[in-house]
């Protein structure tokens, strides 16, 4: 299915396709959509080469703003949930599928990108586009770290600026 011509079509609308199939009934073009919260994080990690694709195992604790968990504990001792200690090394870059969730405090970046609330079952996810999402992508610690790694890899392997630009884009 993934290797089919229909699946691999671009979402760019050409005049000819628009006239022949304005409603996209015949799948003349691919659909346009924003990736989900987990997909965005995984895509960023994959692009930089940091994604750890290990299957199974313990949950990952990605970066979160300092002090956030302590604010939701109401001063009590909640065992491993009292303080948040992000993972380090390869464990930090595991797929988002394995992200550790605290119901009262889901990962903020995931929430910004419409990750479901774990209190209720959601049949269909919301799909919003807000300025806050752009700010999160510009300021999130993991995004910035991935960008630095990608830039370092490009600078170390490609000397020609034009070739580096082509490779990245």
Model-assigned labels for residue ranges:
Residues 1-3:
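Short, functionally critical alpha-helical segments immediately adjacent to catalytic or ligand/cofactor-binding
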């Amino acid at each position: 299915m993934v290797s089919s011509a229909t699946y691999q079509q671009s979402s760019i609308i050409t005049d000819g396709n628009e006239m022949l199939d304005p409603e996209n009934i015949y799948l003349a073009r691919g659909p346009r959509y924003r990736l989900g919260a987990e997909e965005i994080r995984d895509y960023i990690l994959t692009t930089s080469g940091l994604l750890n694709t290990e299957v199974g195992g313990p949950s990952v604790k990605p970066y979160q703003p300092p002090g956030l968990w302590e604010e939701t504990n109401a001063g009590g001792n909640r065992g491993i949930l009292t303080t948040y200690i992000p993972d380090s090394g390869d464990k930090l870059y595991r797929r988002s599928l394995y992200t550790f969730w605290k119901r009262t405090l889901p990962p903020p970046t995931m929430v910004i990108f419409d990750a479901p609330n774990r209190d209720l079952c959601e049949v269909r996810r919301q799909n919003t586009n807000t300025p806050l999402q752009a700010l999160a992508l510009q300021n999130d610690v993991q995004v910035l770290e991935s960008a630095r790694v990608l830039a370092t890899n490009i600078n170390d392997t490609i000397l020609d600026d034009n070739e580096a630009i082509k490779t990245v884009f």
